[in-house]
Amino acid sequence: NKKEEIQLFRGSKYVQSKIGHTYQEAKKLLQTGCLVCFSGTPCQIAGLKNYLKKDYANLITVDLVCRGNPSPLLFRKYLEYQQIKYKNKVTGVKFRDKYYGYNYSTMTLDFEDERIQYHYGMEADLMLKFFFKGLCSKPACHQCVFKSIERVSDFTIFDCWNAKFYNKIMDKKFFPLLIQFCRLTSQLLYS
C-alpha cells in the first residue's frame, strides 16, 4: 500500500511466485469495497477467479504472457551454486537486465561484495539457458490451456522485443506492451 514499494513489482521474474494466502486476502479486501489490482500468471488469475466464485466490480486483473514457471527449488539451488562459486552472498537478482542493451537478455546478480560483477546472457548463465530452452518449467506449463489469444484477465502485459518492426520511433529499443480486454479496462486507461 506504499508508493515507495511500487519498484518491487518491476522486472521479469523467471520463477514461480508463492500465492500463499493472497486469494483470501484479496477476497477480504474486495468484500470491504477496496479496489484490488491482482497480477500474476494466467493460471494464477484463473485460480483467483475460481476461488472468488463471482465477479467483483472493484477487481482489476493483470496477467502476463508466460512461457513457463520454473521451480523455486531450482532457483534456490542456482543461487546456492553462485554463492559457492563466488564465495559471496547474492543480495539481488535481475532476470532480464538491460546491461548489454535492449536486445539481449542478461542475468545480473548483485553480491555483498560489490566488486563482484555478474552480467551473463543465456549462453553462459545456467538459469537463463534452462529457462529459454524450456528445460525448467513444470510439465503442466508445456500444455498450458492459457496460452491463447483469449485471456483470463482485464489486462495482459508482455515484453515486446520486436517493437522496432511496429514503430520506427522505437528503433531497437524494447517497450512493454499492454493489451486491454474489456470496457472497464478501457475506462481505467483513459480516465
Residues covered by each model-derived region:
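Iron-sulfur-associated redox domains of electron-transfer enzymes in respiratory
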Residues: N1-S191
